């Protein structure tokens, strides 16, 4: 029989007491408040403390740069090129005028100087285009003590180095272990809870339990990211029979929204852990999952969504029409499919604060596990959510126009740039139609002016 020495027994006892105290604190201050949807204000106090530390760190670096007669690196938030919103015709007129050529109205034919316009536009696009920079992390104006966000290493003092090292220990040893425990708790409760609810007969009681199980588990998962969320205009929250559309930055957008509302999810059937979660969730709630072979069938997808929204007793569908993650500086083209089925649309704008951690998932650079590790080793996830008034398709609108109107409303409320480009350009080459569009504009300018002159 194996006997413990007195010293070994003491260590085991202390370890057991420590784990008991840790679990008790976890239960009392995090899990129980998450279950009931209340907060003790600890996270907001934590956020205010971090802001003061970031401000102090920035002042220290500015002082170090000043002593060396240098300036700190500052990102160009509006781009590195000053661009005036002028048309192709106006710019070519200006080029011909400055080159002492004849005016465009007098000479509709091709001029050799016209190529300077296209050369300049090409060089501007290579240096600073408005599309590809939306697929990389947003640059910060100040350092947040995460090494991956600092461009001013040479101005770090000894005090800042010690503070950064202390931050690494806190994030990777204390916060990471705590967050993993919370995430495991939330996911386990979601799978077990929804599976058990799924065995109940359909009715109000099952719907009541399903709603509160989902909310409880998502709120625990929100705590696992130390997410500090501010919800605005809750009176506009999506209702049954509608579609909730939002800008898309990260997979955690789902958790952010689902911790404050009850939604039917739409997505492709997965395997592994995600597949286990999906199968458990659909037992308790009418989510809309598609097989891989069905996703490409637009008519089948539209029919399934239409059938869902026509039943006013079913939950609002949560959809991200961009179809890919954007870095939360802009909103890109909304796919029209969600706007063709004639349901009431409830727009939602989500804006993250990158000071505490970059929520953007660059899926072409990081896998899901790496991304979640980055999230759980950040300081926090801070964001604001705005519920906009419901919108319906007008009689004279087609689906594309309706989608653009909803997109503009989301961009305006969230302080994001409204772009017409397709987010699919993250992985695909630019279509020839985009290239041909510039050729058509130039041809129309030349040929059109020539035809007008011939008629007169």
Curated annotation (Swiss-Prot):
Its main location: endoplasmic reticulum. The lineage of its organism: Eukaryota, Metazoa, Chordata, Craniata, Vertebrata. Converts glycerol-3-phosphate to 1-acyl-sn-glycerol-3-phosphate (lysophosphatidic acid or LPA) by incorporating an acyl moiety at the sn-1 position of the glycerol backbone. Active against both saturated and unsaturated long-chain fatty acyl-CoAs. Protects cells against lipotoxicity. The chain crosses the membrane at residues 156-176, 180-200. Glycans are attached at residues 247, 327-328, 362. It comes from Bos taurus (Bovine). One of its GO terms (cellular component) is endoplasmic reticulum membrane. This is Glycerol-3-phosphate acyltransferase 4. One of its GO terms (molecular function) is glycerol-3-phosphate O-acyltransferase activity. GO terms for biological process: CDP-diacylglycerol biosynthetic process. It catalyses: sn-glycerol 3-phosphate + an acyl-CoA = a 1-acyl-sn-glycero-3-phosphate + CoA; dodecanoyl-CoA + sn-glycerol 3-phosphate = 1-dodecanoyl-sn-glycerol 3-phosphate + CoA; sn-glycerol 3-phosphate + hexadecanoyl-CoA = 1-hexadecanoyl-sn-glycero-3-phosphate + CoA; sn-glycerol 3-phosphate + octadecanoyl-CoA = 1-octadecanoyl-sn-glycero-3-phosphate + CoA. Its EC number is 2.3.1.15. Pathway: Phospholipid metabolism; CDP-diacylglycerol biosynthesis; CDP-diacylglycerol from sn-glycerol 3-phosphate: step 1/3. Keywords: Acyltransferase, Endoplasmic reticulum, Glycoprotein, Lipid biosynthesis, Lipid metabolism, Membrane, Phospholipid biosynthesis, Phospholipid metabolism, Signal, Transferase, Transmembrane, Transmembrane helix. It is found in: Endoplasmic reticulum membrane. It is a multi-pass membrane protein.
